[in-house]
């Protein structure tokens, strides 16, 4: 019974003095929240500034790329179908009928030229 009275008295004291600190805690929480929002805002502004700089660099690079006409000619690699309906073979390869799989697909393939 004595322990229950002690715990009840501690509960009453904690409730009474806990309310006194509530205003201080709320002010501290407001300060913390405001500081976090300031930091988030500053971080967001820095990120936006960095993004704008990257976009500017990217646009200048794309302009240089467009000026150079850098598109490469497409060609077929080794063991790729070639012929009138397909693009040409890359350098070092020739479009030939092969016995291995060309007869199955009924089309010539890009292969290394035979030495003979």
Curated annotation (Swiss-Prot):
Signal peptide per UniProt: 1-20
Name the cystine pairs. Answer: 75-90, 82-95, 89-110
Q: Does the keyword Secreted apply?
A: yes
User: TM segments?
Assistant: none
- Propeptide segment residues: 21-74
> Which residues of this chain are annotated as glycosylation sites?
85
| Domain of life the protein comes from | Eukaryota
List cellular component terms (GO).
extracellular region
- Subcellular locations according to the entry: Secreted
Question: Where is it mainly found?
Answer: secreted
Sorted keywords for this record are:
Cleavage on pair of basic residues, Disulfide bond, Glycoprotein, Ion channel impairing toxin, Knottin, Secreted, Signal, Toxin
UniProt remark on domains: The presence of a 'disulfide through disulfide knot' structurally defines this protein as a knottin.
According to its UniProt entry, the function of this protein is described as:
Ion channel inhibitor.
Which protein is depicted?
U16-barytoxin-Tl1f
């Amino acid at each position: 019974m004595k322990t229950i009275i002690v715990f009840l008295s501690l509960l009453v004291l904690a409730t009474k003095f806990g309310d006194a600190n509530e205003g201080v805690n709320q002010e501290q929480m407001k300060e913390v929240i405001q500081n976090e929002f300031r930091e988030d805002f500053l971080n967001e502004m820095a990120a936006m500034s960095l993004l704008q700089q990257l976009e500017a660099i990217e646009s200048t690079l794309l302009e240089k790329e467009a000026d150079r006409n850098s598109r490469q000619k497409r060609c077929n690699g080794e063991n790729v179908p070639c012929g009138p309906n397909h693009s040409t073979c890359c350098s070092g390869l020739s479009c030939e009928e092969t016995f291995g799989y060309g007869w199955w697909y009924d089309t010539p393939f890009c292969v290394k030229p035979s030495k003979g």
